[in-house]
Amino acid sequence: MSRFYRRGASDSDTDSSEDEVEELKANKSAKFRDDLDFMAGPEEDEKRVVRAQKDKKFDELKSLIKQNRDAKSNKDLNKLLTGFDTLAKAYDKSKTIFQRQNVTNPRFYIRFLVEIEDYVNKLWEDKEAKAALSKNNTKALSPLRQKLKKYIKDHGLTDLVSDYRANPDEDGYETPEDENDEDDFEEVPEASPGRQAERAADSESESDSDDDDSFNWSSEPDTNSSDDEENVTKMEQLRRYFLKKEFREESKDDKKDKRKRVIKVKEVVEEDDDDWTPVSREKSVVHFDPNEEVTHDVMIKKLNEVMSARGKRTTDRNQHVANLQKLLEVAEEKQLGLGISVKISFCIISALFELNAKISDYMEYETFMNTLRTVNTLLDLLITTDRVKLSVTYAEEDENLKDENEEYRIQGSILIAVQRLDGELAKILQNADCHSNDYIEKLKAEKDMCQLIEKAENYVELRNHLGIFDKHEVCKVYMMRIEHTYYKYQDQNVGEVAKTMDYLCNKIYTLDDEKRLRQRAMLCHVYFLAVHDKWHRARDLLLMSHMQAIVDHSDVDTQILYNRTICQLGLCAFRHGFIREAHQGLSEIQNTQRAKELLAQAVGTRPHEKTAEQEKIDRSRQVPYHMHINVELMECVYLICSMLLEIPHMASCEFEMRRRMLSRSFHYQLKQSEKASLTGPPENTREHVVAASKAMLNGDWKKCKDYIVNEKMNQKVWNLFHNADQVKDMVVRRIQEESLRTYLLTYSTVYSTVSLKKLASLFDLSKKDVHSIISKMIIQEELSATLDEPTDCLIMHRVEPSRLQMLALNLSDKLQTLAENNEQILEPRTGRGGYQGPGSWFPGRNERQGDKQKGSGGFQGERRGGPGGPDGKRGNWGSQGGQQRRHPQKPRAF
């Protein structure tokens, strides 16, 4: 309909048409305005950022580096390997952009490469941490290490990495790329006032045009003009959006101010002329009223009030300790007596132990030293005065804190505090880095702890006649001193320390009723004797205690101590030259392949088999580092003992089909060495012993000695013994003797007579020693020979077959076994006159008990039915007897 006819329509039609047109126009305008606002929004509300391509690449690299660092912190090496490949590809793509803009290698990228390389190398060298990795992480570790090394070398980053290691960035330092990262975010300045006025005018004109259209939209010229103005305005806004602006630089100080967090401070409003005082969150505890006299009752009441907050969740533990210390100062200032002072001091010690929310958490070193000083002060006070009795047998009603005419009686035990303090020191050492100076500093506290334990022992001996101690507490004090003494080797005053050790152990043997402390004291005593080379006494004490029979029923800590004692006893036997005894003692630990775990020197290598709680318990049982037994030394001693025992045994049983092994682990090492296609010079102690074993098997004792005693072995093994020269002489002597025995057993079928003088010169032994060794071999029937004294010769009887004869016998045995196996395989396939019924396949069914009673050799009767053949029988189930027991049929081989 044209507008001319539309003007003449009725009012109702006009109103309805106006509404329709307005709605249509409003919807169209709103849709276009939304699209325009989407584009123009950043300019009006936010500051638009124009960034260079270099900055975008920097952001991409930093994002990938952050992902890799997250994977490193989570110890996800598989994800770290994938992330490193992605990062390397992204960096290679970005190098062209960097070269185009004359940008060198970013320092943050070099820093990341150094961090990852250090992390991977540290993890590679740490055997315990590497063993604790999962299977996927273990597989990813080696490729990651190789890729990282190859990437740095191929991309020419070796010099940059070395320069960074020489001058690393400090913590919190930002590289120029990091500092300019935000500078590159160039910001568009806000619109000028003139431009804002222009916008306001445009908006007003737009609103005016809208109003005119709403009231007088029927006129064609006005409508066209308003549409043109609106289009011009929209195009102007589009032009402004895509227009490049001039940028202004902000100072770095302004940017740093923007980075700082804005702290909103609430204003203190004054109302009704009242003075308002800001109150802190922590309540300031007012202990006493200034107008009140501080007496014993007031102090006890205030102490109970402070102690009532103990253990509550809302209680500040540090503030609780401070309150008790303030009470102690007031009590000493007012001179309220020893009873109050000792009671408050004991409460302070308990509060210091409770600073940690969890018992499993270890105490901070500063808190430990503070507690140690407090316990030491209280113990000095208890030793100097005999008017104070501190015992767990007293109840709270029986306490006497204020009556000076009587003895002060206080509930508590200073011995339990000393025991718990000793446990806290062990936790601190367990959680400290054993390869740092921090561990050494913390280890110095053990000296103070030992002095405190000796002081507690003196206090027990002074007050034990009063009956204020429990028997178990007294045994614990003696046991603590034993546990701080038994593993230490004493160069000086050995006699005094040995007497002290005997005295302490005898005290526990007498007083303890639970047997656990007696067992531990016995094991510590044996350990102490073994460390100080008292071999026979230590062995007899261990055998008399029968610990090897009852240790399986003991607790885990006692089993760990037993394992440590057995290892130390084996090392002691080796130092004395008792090779077989040393081998037996060390084999119990070395054959399990879990030596560190059994000695509580490391957590198990398979943590997935244990729950988190079990793993935490295992970590709490770990022995501090300064008490460790050198596992590498122990393994080397075990392998040397195995060599001295196994090589002569192998020579005597060379051609036996089934020979007995004395050491499976030693044979495993020999087999692994034989499998190697190329054998280089030995590097570690294990390879030295294997090479020496091969030389001994050939009778070359000098080469064997050179492998065992050299500079490298001196540093790793022999210098760790306090009598290193004696031990090395003993080992060389045993190598000569066992090499002689191996030589005679190997070549006994070759010689008819051997001169003793020749043997003595060959193995650098005296004629007397050679005669003694050969005589012992003849007596033990290891060698079939006779000593001819007039000629000083060894005459071989040659009863044993020669090497060729032994090989022929072995071959005949194997052929006989092969023939028997073939007969058994072919026997079920050969026919025996055709099918004779189902019983013919089961030889055990040839004859039955019922058939014997009938007097027949087989089943001839009729069962379950009519005749089955021409003679009226169902079948013949066997015609031969003689076997009443049914044997299972051998499996058929095809």
UniProtKB/Swiss-Prot annotation:
GO terms for cellular component: eukaryotic 43S preinitiation complex; eukaryotic 48S preinitiation complex; eukaryotic translation initiation factor 3 complex. GO terms for molecular function: RNA binding; translation initiation factor activity; translation initiation factor binding. GO terms for biological process: formation of cytoplasmic translation initiation complex; translational initiation. Keywords: Cytoplasm, Initiation factor, Protein biosynthesis. Residues 845-854 have a biased composition (Basic and acidic residues). Residues 884-894 have a biased composition (Basic residues). It is found in: Cytoplasm. Component of the eukaryotic translation initiation factor 3 (eIF-3) complex. This is Eukaryotic translation initiation factor 3 subunit C.
